[in-house]
Amino acid sequence: MLREAWTLAIETLSWMEMRGLSEPLAFAKTVKQLGIDDPDALRFARVLVFETVRRKNFIDAFINEAVRPSRIDHFGLGLQAFLRLFVYSTRFSKDWSKPDLEEAETVV
């Protein structure tokens, strides 16, 4: 379930960046493309995408600071999406000051 949700979220964010699609349209397109039908995976991916997009500017600033002198927009779309989702899941959905290394290993 976790792998499907992350795959769906990464692909959705990539479609949004590449084609400028809205979140609902990109999500629906990705669900159809990947053929994911697990309701838990769909629900979790939807939350990941929505919350990541909502905080995108702050997340990008955080990532840009971490990868300086490079910038997030210098990476491929899939890596950009993964980094944004990873920062959201490790910094926003949990206590900001305590990185969860076990979860990081599970996601990767």
Where in this protein do the model-derived segments appear?
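Class I Rossmann-like S-adenosyl-L-methionine
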Residues: 1-108
